[in-house]
Amino acid sequence: MFANIGWGEMLILVIAGLVILGPERLPGAIRWTSNALRQARDYVSGATTQLRQDFGPEFEDLREPITELQKLRGMTPRAALTKHLLDGDDSFFTGKFDQQNGKPAAGQEKPVTPVNPPVTATPPSESTATPFDSDAT
């Protein structure tokens, strides 16, 4: 529940509570807040237990689409495309078409790259003039 609140934010909340409520009422406010959170957690767990008892095995059938939606929410666009359009084959994105799921294809070795001599660029000769078209400008 408080996964996004760090220690710095907690310290600021405590200092703000100390300033607003004062040192006399702050322990009572903390106690009341913790009791309210505990009671809310008990209500939620009780509702979950009651749903499981009422629905029985059908409760798991209700949970499956929800967990699938949670998986989709956490996906990146690349992972979603890979999963749904390409059936998990990400060679389109990685460029490794000869490999299946990160492993080399059966009976295939490392590809041999041909060695080509380096090509040197020749500087343009100064005697040739650059073509100029007065109508183009």
Curated annotation (Swiss-Prot):
Organism for this UniProt entry: Mycobacterium sp. (strain KMS)
GO annotation, cellular component aspect: TAT protein transport complex
Protein's job: Part of the twin-arginine translocation (Tat) system that transports large folded proteins containing a characteristic twin-arginine motif in their signal peptide across membranes. Together with TatC, TatB is part of a receptor directly interacting with Tat signal peptides. TatB may form an oligomeric binding site that transiently accommodates folded Tat precursor proteins before their translocation.
Main localisation: membrane
Keyword Zinc: no
Record keyword Membrane present: yes
Name of the protein in question: Sec-independent protein translocase protein TatB
Location in the cell: Cell membrane
Family to which the UniProt record says this protein belongs: Belongs to the TatB family.
Membrane topology: Single-pass membrane protein
Subunit structure: The Tat system comprises two distinct complexes: a TatABC complex, containing multiple copies of TatA, TatB and TatC subunits, and a separate TatA complex, containing only TatA subunits. Substrates initially bind to the TatABC complex, which probably triggers association of the separate TatA complex to form the active translocon.
Domain of life: Bacteria
HAMAP family: TatB (MF_00237)
Entry GO MF terms: protein transmembrane transporter activity
Ranges that cross the membrane: 2-22
Region annotation (Disordered) ranges: 92-137
Coiled coil: none
High-level lineage: Bacteria, Bacillati, Actinomycetota, Actinomycetes, Mycobacteriales
Biased composition annotated in UniProt, kind: Low complexity: 122-131
GO BP annotations, alphabetical order: protein transport by the Tat complex
UniProt entry keywords in alphabetical sequence: Cell membrane, Membrane, Protein transport, Translocation, Transmembrane, Transmembrane helix, Transport
